[in-house]
């Protein structure tokens, strides 16, 4: 009886172990099936996450491209503006250079005109001074011509009148005339007989018989006058014949 009971217990335990093993296998199969079912869901989630990341990356790429394009446009606009500014500045520089050249040309022309005007003025001053000197000299010459005529008359009066009272007065007057002529730098041309004739200072009136050498001055008919090396009146002389 004990052996039967032991066998029964053994069989019962074996059956129990069999059932337990079967249950374990069944549970494992179910877990495997559940895992298979869960795997597609996890794969789908990964794919969705990948798609989201790709979309985000594409969006970021588009945004960067747009920003780069906008920056390029802004840079191009700035470059265009700078080029326009440079063109304006170059035009301004060209205008200023033209104005400078015109100003330099005007200044050169004015300088030339000023030099010509100064030269003309200096020439005018010289001509005016020379003219004034000529007028002064001419006036002095006229005065001297009138004075020497009076002097000649006084000399003749001395030669003809021997009255002592009158002679003293005439001589005094003649000395006064000579002083005036000397103040005006007037010299008397009164050559000595026997000297050579100077055509620039002597006027030959005639040839006469004389004890002087031939072709020399025989006598002075009327003295001459010169002022500042200019002959006012030539001395009138006679020349000895051969």
UniProtKB/Swiss-Prot annotation:
It is found in: Cytoplasm. It comes from the Archaea. It comes from Haloferax mediterranei (strain ATCC 33500 / DSM 1411 / JCM 8866 / NBRC 14739 / NCIMB 2177 / R-4) (Halobacterium mediterranei). Residues 1-75, 93-136 are annotated as: Disordered. One of its GO terms (molecular function) is unfolded protein binding. HAMAP family: GrpE. SUPFAM superfamilies: Coiled-coil domain of nucleotide exchange factor GrpE, Head domain of nucleotide exchange factor GrpE. One of its GO terms (cellular component) is cytoplasm. The keyword Chaperone applies. This is Protein GrpE. InterPro entries: GrpE, GrpE_coiled_coil, GrpE_head. Residues 124-133 have a biased composition (Basic residues). Residues 50-64 have a biased composition (Polar residues). Belongs to the GrpE family. The gene is grpE.
